[in-house]
């Protein structure tokens, strides 16, 4: 069973939803370190002697899931977390990942961040990447994330933020979610 001082606040959402902003604000509010789930895969990509390009990282993520199961990234991350410390995780991909962390002794609180596709596309356009059209990229990334279990993690989140307003609105909701995570109920 997790002790109260072993908390993982895991943030999930589709690309462009605002999950990294929420993770940063929650970490700031609670004085916790942010661990980015994608960094685990990027590090593993380099460890395997590959350049950490988006294609290679995606390929290694799939290989890890074939080798270690759907919760592969959480299994690798759990080995790197310091026992007795609490963290904010940016990029939880599935309920299975949350279950792995809970079995390792952390109390897991999931914050889901939802934003409509049009708003996510606008946000991603500001981070513009060359190559395919952003719509194609968003379609592919959404499909990949949903296949990995993000939809289920969103549906089962302990606190859901609907990110359709201003940055100030998002900050308010993220701080509120942090308070709920700590007290385990209403803020």
Curated annotation (Swiss-Prot):
It comes from Aeropyrum pernix (strain ATCC 700893 / DSM 11879 / JCM 9820 / NBRC 100138 / K1). It comes from the Archaea. ATP binds at residues 13-20. Belongs to the UPF0200 family. InterPro entries: NTP_hydrolase-rel, P-loop_NTPase. Signal peptide: none annotated. Pfam families: AAA_17. This is UPF0200 protein APE_1753.1. Gene3D superfamilies: P-loop containing nucleotide triphosphate hydrolases. Keywords: ATP-binding, Nucleotide-binding. GO terms for molecular function: ATP binding. The lineage of its organism: Archaea, Thermoproteota, Thermoprotei, Desulfurococcales, Desulfurococcaceae.
